[in-house]
Amino acid sequence: MKIITLPDELNIESLQPIQIFDYCSTKEIAKQQIILNQNTFSFLIDGNKEVVFNNSTLSIDNSKFLIMKSGHCLMTEKLSVIRNYRSVLLFFSNETLLKFIRENELNRNKLSEFKSVYSFKYDEFIHRFVASLLDISKLSKSIQKRMLEVKFEEVILYLIEIYGTDFLFSLSEKSNALSQKFIQTVETNWMNKLTLKELAFLCNMSVSTFKREFEKNYAESPIKWFQNKRLEYAHHLLYKEQKSSSEIYFEVGYENLSSFIQAYKSKYGITPKQHHKD
């Protein structure tokens, strides 16, 4: 699968610190490897969107919009009932973000966690804001540049007023140290049914480097570790939540019931059904 770099590969004449792109598609994509070279608002209009980052995963319909940190992610786009996908994208550089924080003298809060993607619900203000972006996109490039600087400040100030500054400082946070980022990626995504290639992409590593780093941190192979984690979670669902094997096998990463039962018996010595009897 080809890696897509945004906004570089969009039909934009020249890259700017703040820029807009009205993205429309009639094709679905699943776990497309994306490199975001700028932070990005995705104002979803039609369809559904899911993004997976190293430290967070979000799915939205067109009642919400996303703001995403620059970096690596896996993106899924699903068409609406009218077989359409549309998202108004507003890109902005890290320099633009840091300049805004400095000029507005915002105080950095101590965050318990840093996330690479946030979702917010649409309201009347945001609906009007998106409509104004579409109007601006029809103007000359020189006017667009000046007006988008104002519009960027407008939407960030509004979101801070409603939601506080946590999202802003998460976006401005520098990347974690390599080992910390690696562990965070694994621990956040072990239930997301990602391939080793997809996990390695989120860590900006080759698959072979990912495997070496994994064994260094976890002292066993990725396949064995992920299988054990999922079986332990299955054990929790069977015991604590009293669910049946047929209800959970797909959720914990197995394509069919028989392979789940076989793996469970291999780990615990008895079948899930025998566990229920006990």
Where would I find each of the regions flagged by the language model?
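Terminal helix-turn-helix DNA-binding modules in bacterial transcription factors
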Residues: 184, 188, 193-198, 205, ...
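N-terminal regulatory/effector-sensing and dimerization cores
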Residues: 14-110
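A short, N-terminal "cap"/entry segment at the start of jelly-roll beta-barrel domains
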Residues: 1-16, 30, 139
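Short, well-ordered alpha-helical segments
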Residues: 125-129
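Short hydrophobic/aromatic patch on the recognition helix
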Residues: 63, 210-214, 259-264
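Short, Lys/Arg-enriched, Trp-marked, Pro/Gly-tolerant hinge/linker segments that flank
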Residues: 111-124, 137-192, 197-202, 216-224, ...
